[in-house]
Design a protein with these regions (language model features):
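Short alpha-helix in the alpha/beta-hydrolase fold that links the catalytic acid
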Residues: 42-43, 168-178
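Serine-hydrolase catalytic machinery in alpha/beta-hydrolase-like enzymes
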Residues: 3-100
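Short beta-strand/loop motif that positions the catalytic acidic residue
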Residues: 157-160, 164
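C-terminal catalytic histidine-bearing segment of alpha/beta-hydrolase fold enzymes
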Residues: 173-216
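Flexible "cap/lid" loop of the alpha/beta hydrolase fold
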Residues: 65-77, 134-155
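A conserved short beta-strand
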Residues: 124-137
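Gly/Ala-rich beta-loop-alpha elbow adjacent to hydrolase catalytic centers
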Residues: 107-111, 115
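Short beta-strand immediately N-terminal to the catalytic nucleophile in serine-hydrolase-like folds
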Residues: 105-107, 132
């Protein structure tokens, strides 16, 4: 796989027309490894209609789909590649966020790594984060991760199955430590979901978004 960005700016699927979405809270969907912007977009109709949903395609080709940053077989990554991917999304967000009163991030798997990275780089920019069957990046002491500014007030939903066969234990351990220190956490464990999303979880996400974003 090449490190070259396939698209100069993200390809985005919107749930509403440009006229309809202006002034509505923005919910940005970030798909997982090897998927595309269609993957999570089917969930848009199951979430509160008050949101304008934008499902963003990752910039790097991976098989028939796309990825935010390269992975090795052990799900390892380069922090610099993660930061480059987050720049790609932040540059796009900077061009659209002025049309919305708030921005919330929803990421699945690698998309959760992206969502939490975006929050850590811009701690004041996001109303909430939803992480589904994913992890937060261990950025070490890299200055671009502004964890010291995250004081536990930003709401975050983290749903996962303890039997998830994809996300490795070291990544769960790091993520557990990070969320406990830096966000207002709603954590839910599911059974029989494996590395996926189920109807019960989407119901919980719906409640979380309504309570933590729309009712604020």
């Amino acid at each position: 796989m090449t490190d070259a960005v396939v698209f100069p700016s993200p390809i985005v699927l919107w749930s509403k027309s440009e006229e309809e979405r202006e002034g509505k809270p923005l919910l940005v969907m970030l798909h997982g490894y090897g998927a595309n912007e269609q993957d999570l977009f089917s969930l848009a109709g199951l979430l509160p209609d008050e949101f304008a949903v934008a499902s963003v395609r990752a910039p790097l080709m991976m098989g028939p789909g796309f990825t935010w940053f390269p992975l090795t077989g052990s799900i390892d990554y380069s922090v610099d590649a993660v930061l480059k991917a987050s720049d790609y999304v932040l540059d796009w967000l900077d061009g659209v966020k002025h049309q919305h009163p708030s921005v919330t991030l929803l990421g699945f798997s690698m998309g959760m790594a992206m969502a939490t990275t975006l929050l850590r780089r811009r701690p004041a920019d996001f109303a909430a984060v939803v992480g589904l069957s994913g992890f937060a990046v261990d950025g070490g002491a890299h200055a671009d991760f502004r964890d010291g500014e995250l004081d536990g007030t930003v709401p975050m939903f983290w749903g996962r199955d303890q039997q998830d066969p994809v996300i490795t234990p070291d990544k769960i351990e790091f993520t557990m430590g990070w969320v406990r220190r830096h966000v207002k956490l709603t954590k839910v464990l599911y059974t029989g979901m494996w590395h996926g999303i189920n109807e019960q979880e989407i119901g919980h996400v719906n409640e979380f978004l309504t309570h933590e974003v729309l009712n604020k």
